[in-house]
């Protein structure tokens, strides 16, 4: 059984619908894979094994359905073949035939006497059409009537969405030529009154296919007149005729695209169907001759479908086939939309879905691509941007800065510039914002100075790169000369306002008129606070306002201090005269409670400090006991040891209430030191027999007295040594 283009499309659409019904349809690749297995004649077990990965529990259900459909198609193909009789031709016999076999398979048959004008055209602006004629092998009247009456209704209910393809096709391409004239033949057909009384059979497909009218030749006409009558019907109705390819289970003729409404196309039919031929063999031989003479682009083609016995192989349509026998009947099929015929067969064409899927994946990968910096980060310090935020964000930092501890970084040389008109406008807006936020005038003045500093910094450093901040030591204090006190106040205010740490760097002076400079120097930097004298402390407080420093980390005090402590610190910052009382400072110190260390108290459970102990007292029992590897240092409760203070096991996992007396481990035996070797020659050498002799014994030369080197450093005995064979020991023989 060959699966043609049309039936392959039908089967594939049915498979796709079934996959969607089972919820296993993802894309077009799975139906393509199933079609390949159908073409390779895979068995049901093989399909079940291959599709179990895709369909899961629905695999057996799907394969049973698919093979049921294929078995029905095979049965439809084999049953009409047993009824064939290829002895006579219908046009050579005078027996009237009222029925013809067309489109047996899965198509629904509707018989009705519809005039040829009842076929509308889906595309009236197009004149192209496809004409197909079918040549049938002769069959007896009884067999034809029996099969048409019984099989048509049966096939209409068995296989609905599919059509069985013609196994193979003979193709004859017909191209119109200027010298092909059949005017006389057409005139004869127009004068024939029988052309208006021709019975028709309309066949409607179950799918979205246009209807086809099948024209039957009258029984009283011979083959030639029947053909001409059909041609006349086609010419009269050509402007409105359209249909699809018709599949005949036994044999069919399919005409490809042809312009029958034009006279030059109709002239091409003279060569094929002329009244000179009196038998079909001569007519077919002439058609083959005409076809072989013209190897030009195809205008229309005459196709004969042959029947093979269950070979199941798909073959390409060939343009040259042998002789044909059988009657010629005609049908018109015009596609609703003319398609461009590809040069390659569908099995060898690229899958469009794969290409579209690859393009979409490529676009997604491009959109997800991010650019990374090529320079590796060498330090892991906090980073702050050069460009500053808006004025509203700066004011928010001012409000937060009131509850924070001011930071003083190592000395910074700062240069501030002020514009003329721009800064006046900004100052007006700043005062309005401050009035809304209800900030005191001192903070407003400081904020204005900081805004000027930020404007200057953003103007000089226009890049958006980040710089690394340096953390200052909390114990450092800066002493500024009296004439530089205003600059120091500005630096302090900047640090209170921003809450950020600033990099120690020199700012580039812009090209502007002379402007006030605020410089912080290292003049008079005192010793660390622990080594400062009282006089130095007095000088510090006279030269600048006191800056309160706490031991909080540079992340801020909110996460480390209690609300009471934050309230006291905020009051201290808001006090302009520095009159923060010692009583309130004592409250701050009392509010700070030391956190317990995560180390077990060695006196527990007999610790006298109770809850005030700085170390951890276990509460919950240990879940890993007795396999706990921490033993007495575990932060959970272990059971009491029954030996308590008398326990001598050093790694006892139990709890000991009383203090144990440490057991001294026995000292390991120390090996006696090796006697030091002396450079003094042993006086008994070479006769010394003491194994632990501390004196020097020279090493013997391996060549002994036979050494020939005059500068040999090894020992050579002065006495004669026995020869080698004399030094060999032999076991004495025992007498029995």
Swiss-Prot record:
**Assembly with partners or alone:** Homodimer; facilitating circular RNAs (circRNAs) formation. Associates with the spliceosome. Interacts with HOOK2. Interacts with ZFC3H1 in a RNase-sensitive manner.
Please give the residue positions where the record annotates the modification N6-acetyllysine: 357
**SMART domains with a match to the protein in the record:** ZnF_C3H1 (SM00356)
An example Pfam family from this entry, by short name, is: zf-CCCH_2
User: What Gene Ontology terms for biological process does this UniProt record contain?
Assistant: mRNA stabilization; regulation of mRNA stability; spermatogenesis; spliceosome-depend formation of circular RNA
Which PROSITE patterns is this protein grouped with?
ZF_C3H1
UniProt function note: RNA-binding protein involved in the biogenesis of circular RNAs (circRNAs), which are produced by back-splicing circularization of pre-mRNAs. Acts by binding to both exon-intron boundary and 3'-UTR of pre-mRNAs to promote circRNA biogenesis through dimerization and the association with the spliceosome. Required for spermatogenesis via involvement in circRNA biogenesis. Regulates the pre-mRNA processing of ATP5MC1; preventing its degradation. Also binds the poly(A) tail of mRNAs; controlling poly(A) length in neuronal cells.
- Residue spans of biased composition, Polar residues class: 77-103, 131-145
Per UniProt, the C3H1-type Zn-finger stretches lie at 595-620, 621-640, 641-656, 682-699, 701-719
What is the name of this protein? Zinc finger CCCH domain-containing protein 14
Q: What else does UniProt say about it?
A: ZC3H14 can functionally substitute for Nab2 in fly neurons and can rescue defects in development and locomotion that are present in dNab2 null flies.
Residues with the modification Phosphoserine, per the entry, are 85, 240, 281, 327, 343, 390, 409, 421, 498, 515, 527, 620
Disease link: Intellectual developmental disorder, autosomal recessive 56: A disorder characterized by significantly below average general intellectual functioning associated with impairments in adaptive behavior and manifested during the developmental period.
The biased composition feature labelled Basic and acidic residues covers 412-423
The UniProt record lists the keyword Nucleotide-binding: no
- Recall the GO molecular function terms of this protein's record: mRNA 3'-UTR binding; poly(A) binding; pre-mRNA binding; RNA binding; zinc ion binding
* GO (cellular component) term, any one: nucleolus
Q: Where is this cross-link: Glycyl lysine isopeptide (Lys-Gly) (interchain with G-Cter in SUMO2)?
A: 99, 139, 175, 198, 245, 283, 295, 357, 378, 413, 489
Annotated compartments: Nucleus speckle
N-acetylmethionine: modified positions: 1
Species of the source: Homo sapiens (Human)
Could you list this entry's UniProt keywords, alphabetically sorted: Acetylation, Cytoplasm, Differentiation, Disease variant, Intellectual disability, Isopeptide bond, Metal-binding, Nucleus, Phosphoprotein, Repeat, RNA-binding, Spermatogenesis, Ubl conjugation, Zinc, Zinc-finger
Disordered as annotated region, ranges = 77-145, 310-350, 398-430
Check the record and name the Gene3D superfamilies matching this protein.
4.10.1000.30, 4.10.1000.40, PWI domain
Describe the family membership recorded for this protein in Swiss-Prot or TrEMBL. Answer: Belongs to the ZC3H14 family.
């Amino acid at each position: 059984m060959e699966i043609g283009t049309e039936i392959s499309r039908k089967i594939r659409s049915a498979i796709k619908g079934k996959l969607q019904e089972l919820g296993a349809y993802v894309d077009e690749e799975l139906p393509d894979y199933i079609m390949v297995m159908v073409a390779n004649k895979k068995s049901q077990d093989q399909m079940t094994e291959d599709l179990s990965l895709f369909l899961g529990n629905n695999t057996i259900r799907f394969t049973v359905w698919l093979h049921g459909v294929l078995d029905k198609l095979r049965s439809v193909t084999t049953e009409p073949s047993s009824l064939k009789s290829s002895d006579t031709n219908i046009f050579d016999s005078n027996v009237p035939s009222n029925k013809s076999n067309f489109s047996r398979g899965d198509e629904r048959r509707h018989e009705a006497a519809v005039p040829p004008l009842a076929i509308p055209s889906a595309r009236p602006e197009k004149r192209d059409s496809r004409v197909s004629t079918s040549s049938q092998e002769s069959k007896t009247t009884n067999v034809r009537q029996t099969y048409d009456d019984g099989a048509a209704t049966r096939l209409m209910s068995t296989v609905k969405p599919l059509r069985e393809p013609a196994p193979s096709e003979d193709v004859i391409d017909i191209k119109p030529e200027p010298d092909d004239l059949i005017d006389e033949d057409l005139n004869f057909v127009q004068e024939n009154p029988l052309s208006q009384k021709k019975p028709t059979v309309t066949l409607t497909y179950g799918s979205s296919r246009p209807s086809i009218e099948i024209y039957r030749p009258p029984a009283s006409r011979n083959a030639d007149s029947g053909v001409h009558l059909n041609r006349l019907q086609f010419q009269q109705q050509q402007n409105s005729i359209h249909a699809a390819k018709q599949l005949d289970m036994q044999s069919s003729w399919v005409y490809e695209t042809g312009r029958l409404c034009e006279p030059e196309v109709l002239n091409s039919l003279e060569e094929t169907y002329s009244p000179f031929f009196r038998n079909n063999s001569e007519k077919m031989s002439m058609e083959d001759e005409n076809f072989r003479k013209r190897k030009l682009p195809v205008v229309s083609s005459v196709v004969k479908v042959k029947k093979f016995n269950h070979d199941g192989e798909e073959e390409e349509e060939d343009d040259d086939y042998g002789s044909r026998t059988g009657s010629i009947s005609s049908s018109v099929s015009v596609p609703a939309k003319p398609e461009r015929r590809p040069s390659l067969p569908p099995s060898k064409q690229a899958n469009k879905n794969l290409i579209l899927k690859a393009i979409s994946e490529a676009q997604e990968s491009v959109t997800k691509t991010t650019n990374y910096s090529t320079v590796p980060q060498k330090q892991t310090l906090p980073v702050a941007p050069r460009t500053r935020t808006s004025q509203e964000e700066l004011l928010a930092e001012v409000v937060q800065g009131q509850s924070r501890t001011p930071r003083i970084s190592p000395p910074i040389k700062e240069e501030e510039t002020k514009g003329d008109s721009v800064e006046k406008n900004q100052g007006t807006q700043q005062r309005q914002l401050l009035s809304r936020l209800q900030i005191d005038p001192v903070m407003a003045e400081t904020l204005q100075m900081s805004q000027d500093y930020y404007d200057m910094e953003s103007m000089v450093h226009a890049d958006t790169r980040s710089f690394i901040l340096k953390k200052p030591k909390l114990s450092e204090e800066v002493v500024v000369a009296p004439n530089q006190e205003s600059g120091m106040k500005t630096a302090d205010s900047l640090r209170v306002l921003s809450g950020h740490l600033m990099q120690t760097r020199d700012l580039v002076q812009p090209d502007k008129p002379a402007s006030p400079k605020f410089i912080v120097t290292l003049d008079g930097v005192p010793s660390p606070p622990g080594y400062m004298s009282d006089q130095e402390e007095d000088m510090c407080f006279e030269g600048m306002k006191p800056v309160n420093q706490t031991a909080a980390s540079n992340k801020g005090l909110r996460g480390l201090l209690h609300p009471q402590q934050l309230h006291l610190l905020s009051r201290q910052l808001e006090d302009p005269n520095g009159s923060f009382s010692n009583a309130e400072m004592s409250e701050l110190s009392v509010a700070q409670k030391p956190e317990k260390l995560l180390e077990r108290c060695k006196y527990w459970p007999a610790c006298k400090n109770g809850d005030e102990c700085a170390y951890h007292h276990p509460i919950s029992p240990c879940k890993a006991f007795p396999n706990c590897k921490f033993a007495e240092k575990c932060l959970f409760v272990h059971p009491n040891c029954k030996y308590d203070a008398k326990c001598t096991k050093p790694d006892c996992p139990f709890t000991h209430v009383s203090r144990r007396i440490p057991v001294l481990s026995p000292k390991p035996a120390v090996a006696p030191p090796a006697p030091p070797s002396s450079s003094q020659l042993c006086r008994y050498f070479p006769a010394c027999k003491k194994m632990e002799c501390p004196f020097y014994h020279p090493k013997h030369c391996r060549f002994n007295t036979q050494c020939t080197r005059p500068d040999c450093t090894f020992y050579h005995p002065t006495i004669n040594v026995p020869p080698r064979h004399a030094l060999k020991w032999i076991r004495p023989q025992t007498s029995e």
